């Protein structure tokens, strides 16, 4: 009989562990992909229009729009909608971009750059076309210049592109926090 109770305890322990796992997942807002949209914890729909680039730096609008859309998709507060039927729409414009040397070596060669952007966002209520939020968000990133003598140009371009991606992600994180404060 002790053998039977031992198996029963193991089964109860496994069931209890499974219940705690499911409870903790539900408690932190986890939902199944196929869950209906009217489930508790409904996320707010948000349409993000492609950003415009008012600077001479190419491709910033694509990087910024993609980073923000990815952050929205990953967030637990919002859901990205691609259609014009969304309740709120977000427009953005990259207004300023600057890149300047931050550090020099003993021979006055640049070893580190800093890049800065100022991105203007405007959140609009779709039904009334009334702005809910207008804000300029500043972001910056730093990158090191390669000391290599063979692939210096390629490494510098890769470092700059990585810094631009970090810059776009930093903007997306700041923007997401601002949207959460505004809409929730």
For the regions a language model picked out, list residue spans one by one.
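A structural "domain/chain start" motif
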Residues: 26-69, 75-77, 168, 173, ...
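Bacterial N-terminal signal peptides that target proteins for export
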Residues: 2-16
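Short coil/turn motifs at beta-sheet boundaries
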Residues: 39-41, 85, 108-116, 170
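Individual transmembrane alpha-helices with interfacial aromatic-anchor signatures
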Residues: 156-170
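Short beta-strand->alpha-helix linker/helix-N-cap micro-motif
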Residues: 47-51, 77-93
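Bacterial N-terminal signal peptides
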Residues: 15-27
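Surface-exposed short loop/turn segments
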Residues: 75, 89-136, 140-159
């Amino acid at each position: 009989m002790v053998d039977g109770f031992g198996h029963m305890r193991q089964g109860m322990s496994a069931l209890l562990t499974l219940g705690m796992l499911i409870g903790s997942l539900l408690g932190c807002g986890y939902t199944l992909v196929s869950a209906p949209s009217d489930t508790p914890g409904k996320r707010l729909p948000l349409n993000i229009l492609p950003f415009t680039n008012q600077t001479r730096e190419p491709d910033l609008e694509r990087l910024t729009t993609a980073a923000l859309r990815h952050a929205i998709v990953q967030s637990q507060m919002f859901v990205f909608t691609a259609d014009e039927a969304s309740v709120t729409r977000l427009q953005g414009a990259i207004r300023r971009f600057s890149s300047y040397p931050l550090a020099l070596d003993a021979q006055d060669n640049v070893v580190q750059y800093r890049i800065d952007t100022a991105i203007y966002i405007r959140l609009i209520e779709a039904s009334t076309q009334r702005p809910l939020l207008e804000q300029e968000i500043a972001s910056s990133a730093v990158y090191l210049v390669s000391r290599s003598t063979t692939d210096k140009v390629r490494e510098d371009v890769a470092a700059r592109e990585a810094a631009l991606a970090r810059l776009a992600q930093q903007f997306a994180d700041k923007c997401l926090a601002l949207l959460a404060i505004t809409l929730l």
